[in-house]
């Protein structure tokens, strides 16, 4: 979670604070811990994956140097890119986004419980979709990089040109809350 949001210890649960909206060394370390936990799982195992908005920065294993990923994230934030554009780029620069975390868990089943913070609940965009197939394309990522004239290394540019997983057969996803539900509850409270 973001710095300052852990309100105490939870027995049996490791809590990590990290950078948001820009990932930092704690983001990378916490993600490495999660990846260590899912190594060697079998088809008999099930991963319960709880996911909410903010995960794009908090859950990260970059495929480019960490400082470069931070720079690209800052460029996107300064450019005015929307969350879908930002996450389309982020997915291609990460070893866990765009369905790749689910691949790390395979052959185990992944049961993903999602709290959506994006209108329309596009599963592949919530926290950059670490446990769902990616609906965005490399063509879209390249167009976004061009639109915002992102300064990218050759390595980052090559990653944007690569596709992400488009199918995952080991994942079940359930949205437990969304912006739409929040707005409906707020409207109901106002009517009372």
Report residues per predicted region.
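N-terminal loops that bind phosphate or other acidic moieties
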Residues: 1-192
């Amino acid at each position: 979670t973001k710095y300052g949001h852990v309100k105490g210890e939870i027995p049996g649960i490791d809590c990590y604070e990290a950078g948001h909206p820009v990932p930092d060394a704690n983001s990378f370390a916490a993600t490495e811990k999660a990846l260590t936990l899912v190594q060697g799982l079998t088809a008999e195992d099930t991963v319960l994956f709880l996911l909410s908005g903010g995960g794009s920065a908090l859950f990260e294993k970059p495929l480019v140097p960490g400082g470069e990923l931070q720079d690209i994230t800052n460029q996107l934030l300064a450019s005015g890119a929307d969350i879908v554009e930002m996450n389309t780029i982020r997915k291609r620069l990460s070893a866990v986004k765009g369905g790749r975390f689910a691949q790390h868990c395979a052959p185990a089943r992944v049961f993903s419980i999602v709290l959506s913070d994006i209108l329309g609940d596009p599963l592949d965009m919530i926290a950059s979709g670490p446990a769902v197939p990616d609906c965005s394309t490399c063509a879209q990522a390249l167009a976004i990089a061009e639109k915002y004239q992102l300064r990218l290394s050759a390595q980052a540019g090559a990653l944007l040109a690569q596709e992400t997983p488009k199918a995952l057969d080991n994942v079940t996803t359930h949205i437990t809350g969304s912006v739409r539900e929040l707005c409906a509850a707020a409207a109901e409270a106002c009517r009372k």
